[in-house]
Amino acid sequence: MAAPAGGGGSAVSVLAPNGRRHTVKVTPSTVLLQVLEDTCRRQDFNPCEYDLKFQRSVLDLSLQWRFANLPNNAKLEMVPASRSREGPENMVRIALQLDDGSRLQDSFCSGQTLWELLSHFPQIRECLQHPGGATPVCVYTRDEVTGEAALRGTTLQSLGLTGGSATIRFVMKCYDPVGKTPGSLGSSASAGQAAASAPLPLESGELSRGDLSRPEDADTSGPCCEHTQEKQSTRAPAAAPFVPFSGGGQRLGGPPGPTRPLTSSSAKLPKSLSSPGGPSKPKKSKSGQDPQQEQEQERERDPQQEQERERPVDREPVDREPVVCHPDLEERLQAWPAELPDEFFELTVDDVRRRLAQLKSERKRLEEAPLVTKAFREAQIKEKLERYPKVALRVLFPDRYVLQGFFRPSETVGDLRDFVRSHLGNPELSFYLFITPPKTVLDDHTQTLFQANLFPAALVHLGAEEPAGVYLEPGLLEHAISPSAADVLVARYMSRAAGSPSPLPAPDPAPKSEPAAEEGALVPPEPIPGTAQPVKRSLGKVPKWLKLPASKR
């Protein structure tokens, strides 16, 4: 409906036949028919006899403001309608789409409400009579009508449906009484399982059909909802088999389980994963023996080497090497000027051209990126895990002390919390971990460091519900070092990362949060290789129409 007068937002000016102008406040969901009715009600005209005209075109009154392609403060004019809209109400054919994908179709008058539309179908009438704590919701385009009161007060004409056909989505949402967050029926019971079995961020090929659907699609309603719940329960255990990256171990983020021997896993690996460059030909046995017999003979020859090979690399214990550093312990190489000159903040033509070239090259790189297969994506993940066997994490405390430690990519956020709690001065302190920007609280303790985007290095912030003077134990604070010394320690333990180049593209390492942000502000970004470099021109050839705020010619 038209927004009340006053306040911000868009507005439209309508010229009535009597020469008076009326200003109507509109929102993106306001229908143009409501603008005409509001103007006619104030000027005592019949809205069925007039249309709205913008410049030389007569507008479609069933369109919403967001789809009408009209500028803000547009000046419209009321003109006599080519054919009167008086008489019996127009019929609209409505297809009501349920959460299971089925549709119920029938014709309704444009003056009927959404509640009457829902009550017309027996399947939906049962859901409305026995909601079971859920709230009926109708979704049309981008408008969402929630609750019985809103459904009874919303007509098809108010949505702009005065003829033709339309599709309205119907779902039953249940709202959490604590957080007032909408959710689907039965979703709270499986929330922990969904969090524990969350797919990897880069494994988009393994996403199930339910993961790609919108959250409202999981809502249930009446008898059709029980059917969908049965489908979901039978579909849940049928998960795709997971092939371990390094021949053994457990799935990242999954429940721990017994390790697999390398011989069985290597035999079951697909060809695309066993050899990224292409499928390798099987070796011919000279003695004509079975390959399994040859593997047993090799295992008997060197059992110790076989045991070391079966031991997964990502499950080997890693030394945490806990170190505490503080930015104030860093010796400044040079004194920073007390105040930067004004010329530093002036925007030059070269700066604009350089930034524009970077944005164009980045957009071109994303648009022309080739499509990769699921096997290639899995090979990329495997290459990343092999390139960075350790994860360097730093936890920043409110008192600016930084706790540094090393982890495996397959370790969970819960392991990180245990590491932080073991070095607190007060182990009973209630705290939470988050990363920024944007602020994301790491509340899922079963999520791996790889899934939490803390790979291969990241800065994690610690927040406490009750502030304390000192957070870390005094023994660590006595041996605090400078951030540069901590960098040397990270470079020493992460030296394996700079190994031989791989045929796969190297992953982009996560930026390390160091107290050198001011240096990065003074150094211009390096140009991306292979992209068009901006042409540097002198400021004397600046066009006359280009006026900079503080340019000096």
Swiss-Prot record:
<dbReference type="InterPro" id="IPR001012">
    <property type="entry name" value="UBX_dom"/>
</dbReference>
<dbReference type="GO" id="GO:0005634">
    <property type="term" value="C:nucleus"/>
</dbReference>
<feature type="domain" description="UBX">
    <location>
        <begin position="386"/>
        <end position="462"/>
    </location>
</feature>
<keyword id="KW-0007">Acetylation</keyword>
<keyword id="KW-0160">Chromosomal rearrangement</keyword>
<protein>
    <recommendedName>
        <fullName>Tether containing UBX domain for GLUT4</fullName>
    </recommendedName>
</protein>
<dbReference type="GO" id="GO:0006886">
    <property type="term" value="P:intracellular protein transport"/>
</dbReference>
<feature type="compositionally biased region" description="Pro residues">
    <location>
        <begin position="502"/>
        <end position="512"/>
    </location>
</feature>
<feature type="modified residue" description="Phosphoserine">
    <location>
        <position position="500"/>
    </location>
</feature>
<feature type="site" description="Breakpoint for translocation to form ASPSCR1-TFE3">
    <location>
        <begin position="311"/>
        <end position="312"/>
    </location>
</feature>
<feature type="modified residue" description="Phosphoserine">
    <location>
        <position position="184"/>
    </location>
</feature>
<feature type="compositionally biased region" description="Basic and acidic residues">
    <location>
        <begin position="206"/>
        <end position="217"/>
    </location>
</feature>
<keyword id="KW-0963">Cytoplasm</keyword>
<comment type="function">
    <text>Tethering protein that sequesters GLUT4-containing vesicles in the cytoplasm in the absence of insulin. Modulates the amount of GLUT4 that is available at the cell surface. Enhances VCP methylation catalyzed by VCPKMT.</text>
</comment>
<dbReference type="GO" id="GO:0009898">
    <property type="term" value="C:cytoplasmic side of plasma membrane"/>
</dbReference>
<dbReference type="InterPro" id="IPR029071">
    <property type="entry name" value="Ubiquitin-like_domsf"/>
</dbReference>
<keyword id="KW-0472">Membrane</keyword>
<dbReference type="GO" id="GO:0005829">
    <property type="term" value="C:cytosol"/>
</dbReference>
<dbReference type="GO" id="GO:0046324">
    <property type="term" value="P:regulation of D-glucose import"/>
</dbReference>
<keyword id="KW-0597">Phosphoprotein</keyword>
<dbReference type="GO" id="GO:0043231">
    <property type="term" value="C:intracellular membrane-bounded organelle"/>
</dbReference>
<feature type="region of interest" description="Disordered">
    <location>
        <begin position="182"/>
        <end position="324"/>
    </location>
</feature>
<dbReference type="GO" id="GO:0031401">
    <property type="term" value="P:positive regulation of protein modification process"/>
</dbReference>
<dbReference type="GO" id="GO:0005737">
    <property type="term" value="C:cytoplasm"/>
</dbReference>
<comment type="subunit">
    <text>Interacts with GLUT4. Interacts with VCPKMT. Interacts with VCP.</text>
</comment>
<dbReference type="Pfam" id="PF11470">
    <property type="entry name" value="TUG-UBL1"/>
</dbReference>
<feature type="modified residue" description="Phosphoserine">
    <location>
        <position position="502"/>
    </location>
</feature>
<dbReference type="GO" id="GO:0042593">
    <property type="term" value="P:glucose homeostasis"/>
</dbReference>
<dbReference type="Pfam" id="PF00789">
    <property type="entry name" value="UBX"/>
</dbReference>
<feature type="region of interest" description="Disordered">
    <location>
        <begin position="499"/>
        <end position="536"/>
    </location>
</feature>
<keyword id="KW-0656">Proto-oncogene</keyword>
<dbReference type="GO" id="GO:0033116">
    <property type="term" value="C:endoplasmic reticulum-Golgi intermediate compartment membrane"/>
</dbReference>
<feature type="compositionally biased region" description="Low complexity">
    <location>
        <begin position="260"/>
        <end position="280"/>
    </location>
</feature>
<dbReference type="GO" id="GO:0005654">
    <property type="term" value="C:nucleoplasm"/>
</dbReference>
<dbReference type="GO" id="GO:0048471">
    <property type="term" value="C:perinuclear region of cytoplasm"/>
</dbReference>
<keyword id="KW-0539">Nucleus</keyword>
<feature type="compositionally biased region" description="Basic and acidic residues">
    <location>
        <begin position="296"/>
        <end position="324"/>
    </location>
</feature>
<dbReference type="GO" id="GO:0012506">
    <property type="term" value="C:vesicle membrane"/>
</dbReference>
<dbReference type="GO" id="GO:0012505">
    <property type="term" value="C:endomembrane system"/>
</dbReference>
<feature type="modified residue" description="Phosphoserine">
    <location>
        <position position="275"/>
    </location>
</feature>
<dbReference type="InterPro" id="IPR021569">
    <property type="entry name" value="TUG-UBL1"/>
</dbReference>
<feature type="modified residue" description="N-acetylalanine">
    <location>
        <position position="2"/>
    </location>
</feature>
